[in-house]
């Protein structure tokens, strides 16, 4: 993963002037020791400045964490805390921030050793609101050193995603395909969440591709593809063109990222791509996504934005799939019913033509795009990476500016079942509790497109917090609600 941030969280303790400063300082030291004992000490930095009711201390702490290379901040209330200067620190720190508070350690020290940070967190939240400052506050933000170490560690993937978004450029090629309004992408919300976008024509990409013909690096890329594919290299004749295309994209990224640190690509793949380029780009998309540079299909700008968020959160390859087809009843009865605790309507197949990273596919093979080959010569549709998706935990999610130009998101945890799909493409049998109701009352009701991002693991907790942090209204962050919790649009008589 070479396209995601490495985070360093500066821990700044704060203290109310009528409380012992030593209480905050000693608790900060205990917190830092606890983190180093449980996690990677390189994730954090202990700021030696304790802010005590002083805007001057605030400036000193701010300059110190900047000088230490911190790109995220933890304001630690070691006692009640100075509500003005602690929130000013958050205001002036340019990066993701969180607030946590110290719990009282023992019943034997509740006179001089009582810090009242439980109370101070309330005033901190009030002051954050007064100054319109966004910050991550854990579900229960008060704890001892071990508890707070865990909270900071849980903040890491959230901070990675937020910092990544604020330094991301999406590069797109071409408008979405004809008759494909579902990938409509109102760009205003991209800017609202801190993302830049560079929109190019497909012709620009084609010109750059042609200029890479005969590039001296192509043979080495072909060898790398051959190593990756192994026995799945069923289309060796197309690898040279695919390598040429991969180098085209990578060079474009290097030349066009500008002042941004991270890049994601929304690429075109039909209808003219195959006939002009002479292949489909699915395999190249999968390779770049596996390195942390997500490449979406069908110029899905919010799809690749979602993929990038998942890459930052999981530090792993993700994919983008169609919420594609139902599981046949005979397949459900034969392979799922009685073996797994899912209803038939909890299951569906997630599919795309061949864009999923080889590490996430069972026995991956290079093939051709069967759907396109129904109307085109097979030789111009080569380039898909196909196979059943590896079974295991997944999170299906998406951030989207919908048709009304509002920003919404959904998150649903589930799994890919170890059930043979008996089909083609990058495909898997997915199971999500109460998927049928979620499909109707979230995906359909709120006008989501058919593409969903997939992270390989359960990352719902972090993704939910990322969406909250970047300003998605909480009423528009949906999940697969249990049967005991009806959706607002759900018919109570069904």
Q: Residue locations for each model-derived region?
A:
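Short, acidic/small-residue loops that bind anionic groups at enzyme active sites
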Residues: 88-115, 122-127, 286-299
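N-terminal basic/disordered segments at the start of proteins
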Residues: 1-37
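Periplasmic-binding protein-like
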Residues: 70-79, 98-100, 262-267
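Short, well-structured alpha-helical segments in soluble
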Residues: 57-70, 87-89, 248-258
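Cap/lid and interdomain-hinge subdomains that line or gate substrate/regulatory clefts
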Residues: 2-9, 43, 105-233
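Long, internal scaffold/assembly segments composed of regular secondary structure
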Residues: 222-313
